[in-house]
């Protein structure tokens, strides 16, 4: 019997790891990856950090360059897909080529959620999703330039830190009442706000841009009535899933391709993962997880599901952020206001713990990354703790 053909659409983390996972899990059939980028699949997290800060930055490839040929994966880079061919099982490119598939994995990622008021500035306005975006930013983030960043989420704060380290004068505008309000607990939000302010970043909370005038400098009028002058304007206010191909194929979408917990779409032969995907939970709610690890996890899950293998167990959600000299790692459930702190954040070494009825459900480490491994095991096992012992620095965590 002829082996099936699997096509992967996308060129990022989830796409590359899906190819790797399929081969690792025993798939020996024909495997193709189609991407509109000309680079080999590369790591996205460094774009806001090392790609802006290192003297001679290089893209970090997800897989070694020789891996693709050695594992008989056909790479089609710099191509544009016209249609997925859901009914015909023939993917069609804009150049007229068509490629048969038996199963499809979509990992087309996401674009920056648009902000029309700033998009009208054209090339004077910047977002960060791809290597080319980082290269453009690197050129304009020069010492003493005034930089305005709209959005104080993870990407906004990482860019603020990098721009400050490049000796720019940075102002951050945030509509919400706090920084990283969507994915950090209150004590970590307070720490990060203070950390940036101490570094010289001006952070304007509960504020937004009302009017923009493009001149020698960009003039930004805020809701508060204040006017800012900027050499460089950057924004990061969320994502817009690259779901157009899926919509045109009549797959279920909701600012993301709707998948189940096996990464399967409404078509049993089509799977999706990474930032383009949004999971429908058992209770009907839709949940998106935008992280490097989630892309890896969903690639492994989709590969197993495509091959009819048992699905791997999901670890607790985890992501990290590097800002200035700080490494913060977030694991588990970030909800809730009652967090315990081990250590002193003022010394830039601390761990915040989230206990629910004594059970550890989440944690954030500040420059204590070596502790993530035991914490992950505790969260997975539902381990209970005495709060006083957990925050006592005289007691080694590994002894608890």
UniProtKB/Swiss-Prot annotation:
Q: At which positions is FAD bound?
A: 5-36
Q: Which residues form a coiled coil?
A: none
Which keywords does this Swiss-Prot/TrEMBL entry list?
Aromatic hydrocarbons catabolism, FAD, Flavoprotein, NAD, Oxidoreductase
**Listed GO CC annotations:** cytoplasm
Specify one Pfam family: Reductase_C
* E.C. number: 1.18.1.3
Q: Which reaction(s) are listed as its catalytic activity?
A: 2 reduced [2Fe-2S]-[ferredoxin] + NAD(+) + H(+) = 2 oxidized [2Fe-2S]-[ferredoxin] + NADH
Q: Which cofactors, by name?
A: FAD
Q: Which residues bind NAD(+)?
A: 146-174
Example GO biological process: 3-phenylpropionate catabolic process
Q: Which InterPro entries match?
A: FAD-oxidoreductase/Apoptosis (IPR050446), FAD/NAD-bd_sf (IPR036188), FAD/NAD-binding_dom (IPR023753), FAD/NAD-linked_Rdtase_dimer_sf (IPR016156), HcaD (IPR023744), Reductase_C (IPR028202), Ring-hydroxylating_dioxygenase (IPR053382)
Q: What class of enzyme is it?
A: oxidoreductase
Kindly list the cysteine pairs connected by disulfide bridges.
none
> Does Mitochondrion show up as a keyword for this record?
no
Q: Which GO terms describe its molecular function?
A: 3-phenylpropionate dioxygenase activity; ferredoxin-NAD+ reductase activity; oxidoreductase activity, acting on NAD(P)H
Which pathway? Aromatic compound metabolism; 3-phenylpropanoate degradation
UniProt lists the family membership as follows: Belongs to the bacterial ring-hydroxylating dioxygenase ferredoxin reductase family.
Described function = Part of the multicomponent 3-phenylpropionate dioxygenase, that converts 3-phenylpropionic acid (PP) and cinnamic acid (CI) into 3-phenylpropionate-dihydrodiol (PP-dihydrodiol) and cinnamic acid-dihydrodiol (CI-dihydrodiol), respectively.
Q: How does it assemble?
A: This dioxygenase system consists of four proteins: the two subunits of the hydroxylase component (HcaE and HcaF), a ferredoxin (HcaC) and a ferredoxin reductase (HcaD).
Name the chain's protein. 3-phenylpropionate/cinnamic acid dioxygenase ferredoxin--NAD(+) reductase component
């Amino acid at each position: 019997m002829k082996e099936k053909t699997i096509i992967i659409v996308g060129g990022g983390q989830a796409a590359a790891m899906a190819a790797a996972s399929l081969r690792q899990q025993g798939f020996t059939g024909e495997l193709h990856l189609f991407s509109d980028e000309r680079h080999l699949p590369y790591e996205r997290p460094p774009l806001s950090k090392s790609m802006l800060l290192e003297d001679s930055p290089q893209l970090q490839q997800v897989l070694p360059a020789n891996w693709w040929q050695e594992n008989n994966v056909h790479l089609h880079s710099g191509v544009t897909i016209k249609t997925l061919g859901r009914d015909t099982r023939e993917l069609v490119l804009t150049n007229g080529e068509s490629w048969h598939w038996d199963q499809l994995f979509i990992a087309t990622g996401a674009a920056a959620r648009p902000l029309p008021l700033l998009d009208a500035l054209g090339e004077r306005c910047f977002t960060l999703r791809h290597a080319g975006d980082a290269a453009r930013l690197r050129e304009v983030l020069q010492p003493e330039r005034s930089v305005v960043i709209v959005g104080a989420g993870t990407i906004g704060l990482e860019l603020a830190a990098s721009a400050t380290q490049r000796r720019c004068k940075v102002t951050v505008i945030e509509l919400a009442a706090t920084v990283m309000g969507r994915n950090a607990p209150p004590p970590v939000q307070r720490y990060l706000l203070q950390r940036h302010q101490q570094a010289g970043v001006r952070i304007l909370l509960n504020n937004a841009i009302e009017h923009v005038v493009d001149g020698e400098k960009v003039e930004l009028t805020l809701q508060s009535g204040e006017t800012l002058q900027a050499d460089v304007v950057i924004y990061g206010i969320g994502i817009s899933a690259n779901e157009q191909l899926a919509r045109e194929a009549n797959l279920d979408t909701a600012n993301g391709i709707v998948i189940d917990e096996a990464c399967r779409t409404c078509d049993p032969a089509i799977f999706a993962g990474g930032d383009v995907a949004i999971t429908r939970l058992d209770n009907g709610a839709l949940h998106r997880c935008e992280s490097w690890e989630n892309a890896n996890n969903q690639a492994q899950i989709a590969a197993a599901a495509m091959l009819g293998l048992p699905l791997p167990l999901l670890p607790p959600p985890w992501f990290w952020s590097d800002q200035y000299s700080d490494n913060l790692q977030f694991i588990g459930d970030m909800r809730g206001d009652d967090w315990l702190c081990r250590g002193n954040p003022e010394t830039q070494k601390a761990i915040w713990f989230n206990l629910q009825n004594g059970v550890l459900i989440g944690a954030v480490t500040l420059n204590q990354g070596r502790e993530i491994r035991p914490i992950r095991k505790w969260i997975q096992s539902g381990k209970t703790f005495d709060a006083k012992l957990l925050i006592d620095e005289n007691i080694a965590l590994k002894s608890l």
